[in-house]
């Protein structure tokens, strides 16, 4: 009877919480015309839907917990026109358990030169189907060792600061010291002078992304300055000839170089490097980086730092489908076909064999299983 009473009480609480949650609608034909108006009215657990359109100069602070902030229809565009809330970002998210979907963020600047599309100051964030561009920073987060962040099916590009003028870097993605960061099925490109992806998370999972310079030259494609545990699987990496740094990937460049428990797994990625004399990886730590089934193409010929290599192919006749447009799928005559091995499990039990592959733009698809695995980010279908 006591258990039943407690159960009824819990169910009653859940029902009350669910009943209190509301959906706030924003749009030119709605009572709430701007997202910033909804930010002042929303309660914990609410859903805020925003009609498609451009919302110029509108910035907001969201202090609530458990929010879903969702654009409807064609992309909702928050063009801040140089403004930022709290001199930080278009949206400053202070609460926990926040989801942001189908929204475009651009134009953020701040006097501190780190005006972001989103500044996240809470615990646990999910970003889906969003586009961050032409801000000083795309996404910027703080330190929170309890926080997990997931970005999927999203695009970040051209978030930067004029380094020649100000001497500071802007990054497409800058993740602070959090517990767990996952980036998957996303398109991260053209971080001029800054990094495409910079993360100080304790665990980093970069899965099935296209991370590339293309029109600009980034500092690093991926910078993990504090090391940690990192799993880079099934990505396309392209570094341009005018990149700021020689290395495509940097691991533990700033801290924890002598920490023996760090782990770096680089599995079934395709690297194309147009930077003459560059390196695919610069591992600054004493930990041994594990590289398996990677396709390594272009001007770079070096992997710097302790490493263990298995079934990688360097500068072979890869026969990529449309390399000039960064389409690195394999043609039937590629030397990468059936040349890989089953990479097995990481030390923590994480499966290293790629289950998916990137599909442009901003998508993923199941990677076929046909005979021995192909080297690189793509499996030739129908072989």
Regions found by a protein language model. Name each.
Residues 48:
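Glycine-rich N-terminal segment of FAD-binding domains in flavoprotein oxidoreductases
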Residues 36, 51, 56-329, 333-335, ...:
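Extracellular beta-rich repeat passengers
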Residues 18-37, 41, 319-324:
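Right-handed parallel beta-helix/beta-solenoid
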Residues 7-9, 27, 376:
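N-terminal non-cleavable signal-anchor helices
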Residues 1-4:
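N-terminal secretory signal peptides that target proteins for export/translocation
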Residues 24-28, 284, 368:
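Alpha-helix initiation/capping motif
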Residues 7-17:
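Bacterial N-terminal signal peptides
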